[in-house]
Structures are given as C-alpha cells and as structure tokens.
Regions:
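Helix N-cap at the beta1-alpha1 junction of Rossmann-like dinucleotide-binding domains, i.e.
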Residues: 36-39
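Hydrophobic/small residue at the entry helix of a nucleotide-binding pocket
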Residues: 12-15
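C-terminal catalytic/substrate-binding lobe primarily of soluble NAD(P)-dependent oxidoreductases
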Residues: 155-410
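Conserved Rossmann-fold cofactor-binding substructure of NAD(P)-dependent oxidoreductases
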Residues: 61-74, 87
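Rossmann-fold NAD(P)-binding glycine/threonine-rich loop
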Residues: 106-133
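Rossmann-fold cofactor-recognition segment
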Residues: 49-63
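N-terminal Rossmann-like NAD(P) cofactor-binding module of classical short-chain dehydrogenase/reductase
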Residues: 71, 77-81, 102-103
Length: 410
C-alpha cells in the first residue's frame, strides 16, 4: 500500500490534494499535514472515501522532534514537500530519519536569499543512496516539466540544440490591476534581482531588466518580456550541461513595474532586516505579508497563461526552431480547484512525479531531477492529470534587445 505524507497545506495543496484524490489506485492513503489542522481537515471531509483514506496531522517542520514523531507513527512511503523552499533541507532530513522517499516542486532557496542553492540538495545524494531511498527535487512545472521538455527536445525534436529560451508570458488579468497572478515574492524577487543566463559553460549576470524581448505566443499574442533570474536556469544548466545558452524571459504588467519602482526607491524591496521596536524584519517580508495574497488574486483571475520552451538548433544541418508549451485557463483552474493556474501547473507535475515514484518508474537511489529519466512516461502522465502540452513547429523568433526599460512592460 502506498502511503503518502503531504507536508504543507497552503495554496498549492488546493490543487495537489484533489489530484492525489483522483488517483486512489496509486495513493491508497494520504496524510495531509500543516500548521493549520483545521484547514487539513477540510480535505479529509471532502476527499476521504472507501477507496482512499485521508488522515490529517498538525506539523511545524521547525519542531524537529514532534515532526519526526508524527511522521514515524504515520510511516509513509513517500513525502511530498509543499512547505516553503527554504525548508527543503529539513524535510529531506526527516525523510532520511523515517526512511521515506522524497519529492518537492521547488529547488532550495535559503531564507533571505534571491538565488537557489541546488548543490545543497545534491549534497544529500550519498545519504539517500545509503538508505536505498529516492529523492526527486524540482518536480514542479518550472523547473520540472521544463527539464522534461528539454530532454524531449534533445532526443526527439532536434539533432542539436544551440539555444534554449524559457518564455513565461505571465498573462491574464485580475481585480488588482497593479498585481500579477504569480506570487508577489516571486515577482518582486525576479524584477529586483540581476538577470542571469547560462552561456559558454557558466552562469553570467546582467543588471535588472536590462535585456528586453518580444514574443508572439500561441493564443496569447505578442508581449513584452524581460530576461530575469529563475531557478530553472540552475536546474537545466546542471542537468543538461550540453546546451550552450539558456535564458529565462517573463512578462510583467506596466502598472506592477511602476509600483515596484516606487517601493524599491523607498527601500521596501530590501531583504536586509531592520529593527522595528526590537523586532528584526526585512522590508520585503513585511511587504509580502500586507499585500493581497495569491489566493485573493486567483479568485478574480481571467484569461490564459502560457509557459513554453523555445528551442533553437538544427535538423540534418538545417536551422530549426520549435516551441514546446502549455496553456492554462485561470478561471477554469479556480472553478475546478479553487487554485491559481500557476499552482495547478505545478501540482499536475508534482502528482505525476509522485506517480512515477510509487509505481517504480523513478526508482533510483540518491538525489535526482526528472531530466535524468526518460521524459515520455512523465509527459504522458502529465496529460493524464489534465495538463496538456503542444509543440509548435516553425516557431516565431524571440526578438531580443539590450537595455530594456521598465516603461516597456505591458
């Protein structure tokens, strides 16, 4: 019997738990745990059945002893980590103690940092090997599905690849014209930090928003984009090192950019803690707490968002460019799951990865990313979970220009 422990009952659980509940043949028993047991209990009431038992538990991953006791009592085969990414290492430690396989959606980003530390998770490789356990890291959409897209493109679409551009249209509207549909902390981090790209075997940085581009995305249209930092660059450059150039471009509303410029000018995007009546708090952390949360935005989001991988290379010596992409409707996701389109995309990837682990298709001791496995079974499972993808042959060019400006946002 496959017993799954889900750690974290935040916004992403809104899509993960329903998707797990649709697969009782693979997940016979689920324990939903989080800091709010009341919230966990709502999933038990809604989804527990004769075919699939759901139990709940309170968990504070920072309380090591109580968390370990709870996990040992439940004795899961697999732990799905939905906690904030800065807690990844603590959850990995837990899996080693209770001898359970591990799965997360986001790479480890130390608290207060703007960059992921993929090597910190890979440092656990030998420990998981010694225990005979599998740990799959970065199994969301981005990274995750994007890694599979890269592997698929290299094996099936092109003979050689010279350039990979991740294009996140970040599209759709909501009732807050100055806010994006993606998490506030993610968007703020991306536009406040230096842009990064992988080229000639190393990662280089450029000033924030200094590289602009335009792209015509299927069913969305032509939008302005900026090259930004993203953990998928670390993932792809590590797992697919033969790719000469890897970049990440994302779109932002002009009103959002204007708001962030003002906040940045007055110091509110700083990650350096300041003393307020004896309490140490980073301005960015405070800002994130007082701004509307993604749950509020998802309820009013409309339109579609699209993310794709534009691969440039050659087939039989002739230049070829193709776009592998996914499109998701904001309203449809909220009506079905009460979740954002972004969370659904990551949830579908995560549950597909969980399926790969419990069925033995991803049984490999140590710490791995999904690009180490044949991408086609995973992509097939992704479609079964409701997230389709398409391939656009003869894809349009990405129009890139240096020295972008914030005024060039949508």
């Amino acid at each position: 019997m496959n017993r799954v422990l889900v750690i974290g009952c935040g916004k992403m659980a809104r899509a993960v738990i329903p998707l797990l509940a649709r697969n009782p043949e693979f997940f016979r028993e689920i324990c939903v745990s989080g800091r709010s047991k009341e919230k966990c209990d709502t999933y038990k009431k809604k989804y527990s059945s004769d075919k699939q038992k759901i139990v709940t538990a309170f968990v504070d991953i920072n309380n090591k002893e109580k968390t370990r006791l709870m996990a040992k009592i439940y004795n899961p085969d697999l732990v799905i980590n939905l906690a904030p990414s800065y807690l990844n290492l603590k959850v990995m430690d837990l899996c080693l103690e209770i001898e359970a396989n591990y799965l997360d959606a986001s790479l480890y980003i130390p608290k207060g940092s703007t960059q992921c530390d993929i090597n910190a998770e890979y440092a656990y490789d030998q420990k998981f090997r010694e225990k005979g356990l599998t740990a799959i890291i970065g199994c969301g959409f981005n990274p995750g599905v994007m890694n599979a897209f890269g592997q698929y493109a290299a094996g099936k679409l092109l003979d050689e690849i010279s350039k990979v551009d991740i294009i996140d249209m970040n599209a759709g509207t909501n009732a807050h014209p100055y806010l994006m549909n993606t998490p506030m902390n993610t968007s703020l981090r991306q536009i406040s930090s230096e842009g990064r790209m992988f080229t000639d075997g190393k990662i280089i940085s450029v000033p924030p928003l200094s590289v602009q581009a335009k792209y015509s995305f299927p069913e969305i249209g032509k939008r302005n984009l900026f090259m930004v930092d993203h953990e998928v660059i670390d993932a792809l450059s590590t797992e697919l090192p033969g790719m000469p150039t890897i970049r990440y471009f994302s779109g932002f509303k002009r009103t959002f950019m204007s708001m962030v410029k003002v906040l940045r000018d007055v110091g509110m995007t700083s990650t350096t803690p300041v003393d307020i009546d004896g309490q140490q708090i980073a301005p960015l952390d405070f800002l994130y707490e007082v701004m509307p949360q993604q749950d509020d935005l998802a309820a009013t989001a409309k339109g579609k968002t699209g993310i794709g991988m534009l691969v440039t290379g050659a087939v039989e010596g002739e230049k070829k460019q193709e776009l592998i992409y996914a499109l998701v409707d904001h309203q449809q996701c909220y009506e079905e799951f009460g979740a954002s389109a972004t969370d659904f995309m990551s949830a579908a990837a995560l549950v597909s990865g969980a399926n790969m682990i419990v069925t033995g298709q991803w049984k490999q001791d140590g710490v791995h990313m999904i690009s180490e496995f044949d991408p086609q079974p995973f992509l097939k499972e992704l479609k079964r979970q409701g997230l389709d993808y398409k391939v656009l042959e003869e894809a349009p060019d990405l129009e890139v220009s240096e020295h972008g400006t914030e005024e060039e946002a949508e």
